């Protein structure tokens, strides 16, 4: 049932998955002038020598032909390497745990891809993200997707007004089950394709093995904060704050967890117990602060925040500092705050923006062992 949208061109980022397939299908049904673009961001083959990107592009072709839209593949490998993968490696060198999805959305999907789409005459770009945009006056608000389990605003926190004004998220008002139902009803080739998980350029491969191809591993000591040596680690880059698995520490009592790293001494700090006090902090300093609206922000404001994907919101007070960083003070102590990850601010369902966790604090003292 077409409406009068035929003079509005929407370029859809199609990954070969069910979400972007349904996105393209919905927009086509609504009468838009739809073009599908497959972004080739990584030159990759799996352990069987099969290029997973080729398989995904084949699915894009099948779906595009089914719904009757033109499609193209565009190579963003250089941009992805320069803007996302280089950043990913640099963060790991610093002992941090980066979030490449945030950078990919900021630099590739809603920058390089958006610019390419505009060269094709696009009025908007659309993706299969579970998020919503809403026009309020001259501003576009970024809102959580209605499916709490799939909401992806955490990864979109760095988008600007200029980017949001050009974006459509047709799946934002739906549950994942509805999306699958639409795909099945429409007979789309990707209706039963399983969702991709993990970091796109690692895919199904072993994370340690992948990282060691780019960064040399430097094994070292595993110690408690009091200095007791408990074993060896395989390389600091393989561990993240709060991690339990892969430590290889036996014995009685509660499990052991990563609580910090000393990059200079190449030491991994571990402590026993999920709720060990060294895992908790009450504030952080964040860099790369970005807001989704242009509205003037007070120097201090209260909101809620997420410190990792799918985490429950925490009440916080944000103090914007003159050097462009922000101090984020938690209403209650939070476990396993991890440098390199995103801190994302919310006002109800509105995603206000966010930044990158830089340092972690407790009782107004920096926790040097965290990083």
UniProtKB/Swiss-Prot annotation:
Spell out the GO cellular component terms annotated for this protein, sorted alphabetically and separated by semicolons. Answer: cytoplasm
Q: Where is this site: Interaction with tRNA?
A: 129, 341
- GO molecular function annotations of the record: ATP binding; tRNA binding; tRNA-uridine 2-sulfurtransferase activity
What Pfam families does the entry give? tRNA_Me_trans, tRNA_Me_trans_C, tRNA_Me_trans_M
**Ranges where the record places region Interaction with tRNA:** 150-152, 308-309
- Please give the SUPFAM superfamilies that the UniProt record associates with this protein: Adenine nucleotide alpha hydrolases-like
List residues binding ATP.
13-20, 39, 128
Keyword Cytoplasm recorded: yes
User: Disulphide bridges in this chain?
Assistant: 104-200
tRNA processing is among the record's keywords: yes
Q: Where is this region: Interaction with target base in tRNA?
A: 99-101
Locate the coiled-coil region(s) and give their ranges: none
The subcellular localization recorded is: Cytoplasm
Q: Write down the EC number.
A: 2.8.1.13
InterPro entries this protein is in? MnmA-like (IPR004506), MnmA-like_C (IPR046885), MnmA-like_central (IPR046884), MnmA-like_central_sf (IPR023382), Rossmann-like_a/b/a_fold (IPR014729)
Question: Where's the active site on this chain?
Answer: 104 (nucleophile), 200 (cysteine persulfide intermediate)
> Could you tell me the Gene Ontology terms of the biological process aspect for this record?
tRNA wobble position uridine thiolation
- Entry keywords, A to Z: ATP-binding, Cytoplasm, Disulfide bond, Nucleotide-binding, RNA-binding, Transferase, tRNA processing, tRNA-binding
Could you tell me what this protein does? Catalyzes the 2-thiolation of uridine at the wobble position (U34) of tRNA, leading to the formation of s(2)U34.
Fetch the NCBIfam families from UniProt: PRK00143.1 (NF001138), trmU (TIGR00420)
**What does the sequence similarity comment in the record state about its family?**
Belongs to the MnmA/TRMU family.
PANTHER family associated with the record = MITOCHONDRIAL TRNA-SPECIFIC 2-THIOURIDYLASE 1, TRNA 5-METHYLAMINOMETHYL-2-THIOURIDYLATE -METHYLTRANSFERASE
Q: What is this protein called?
A: tRNA-specific 2-thiouridylase MnmA
Q: Which organism is it from?
A: Listeria welshimeri serovar 6b (strain ATCC 35897 / DSM 20650 / CCUG 15529 / CIP 8149 / NCTC 11857 / SLCC 5334 / V8)
Q: What gene is this protein a product of?
A: mnmA
């Amino acid at each position: 049932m077409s409406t009068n949208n035929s003079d509005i061109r929407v370029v859809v980022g199609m990954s070969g998955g069910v979400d972007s397939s349904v996105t393209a299908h919905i927009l086509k049904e609504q009468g838009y002038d739809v073009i599908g673009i497959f972004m080739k961001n990584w030159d990759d083959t799996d352990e069987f020598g099969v290029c997973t990107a080729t398989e995904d592009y084949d699915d894009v072709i099948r779906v595009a032909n089914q719904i009757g839209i033109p499609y193209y593949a565009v190579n963003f490998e250089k941009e992805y390497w320069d803007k996302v993968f280089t950043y990913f490696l640099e963060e790991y060198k610093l002992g941090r745990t980066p979030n490449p999805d945030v950078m990919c959305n900021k630099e590739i999907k809603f920058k390089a891809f958006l610019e390419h789409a505009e060269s094709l005459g696009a009025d908007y770009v659309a993706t299969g993200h579970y998020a919503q945009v809403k026009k309020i006056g001259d501003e576009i608000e970024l809102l959580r997707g209605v499916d709490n389990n799939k909401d992806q605003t955490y990864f979109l926190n760095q988008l600007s007004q200029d980017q949001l004004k050009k974006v459509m998220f047709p799946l934002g008002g739906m549950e994942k089950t509805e999306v699958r139902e639409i795909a099945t009803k429409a007979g789309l080739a990707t209706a039963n394709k399983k969702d991709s998980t993990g970091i796109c350029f690692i895919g199904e491969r072993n994370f340690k093995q992948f990282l060691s191809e780019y960064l040399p591993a430097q094994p070292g000591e595993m110690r408690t904060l009091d200095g007791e040596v408990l074993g060896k680690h395989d390389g600091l880059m393989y561990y993240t704050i709060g991690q339990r698995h892969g430590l290889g520490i036996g014995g009685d009592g509660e499990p052991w967890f990563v609580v910090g790293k000393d990059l200079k001494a190449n030491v991994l700090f571990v402590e026993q117990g999920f709720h060990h006090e060294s895992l908790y902090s009450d504030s952080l300093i964040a860099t790369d602060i970005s807001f989704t609206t242009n509205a003037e922000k007070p120097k201090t404001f209260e909101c809620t925040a997420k410190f990792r994907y799918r985490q429950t919101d925490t009440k916080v007070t944000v103090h914007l500092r003159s050097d462009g960083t922000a101090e984020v003070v938690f209403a209650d102590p939070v476990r396993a705050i991890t440098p390199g990850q995103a801190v994302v601010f919310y006002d109800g369902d509105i995603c206000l923006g966010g930044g990158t966790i830089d340092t972690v604090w407790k009782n107004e003292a920096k926790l040097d062992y965290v990083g």
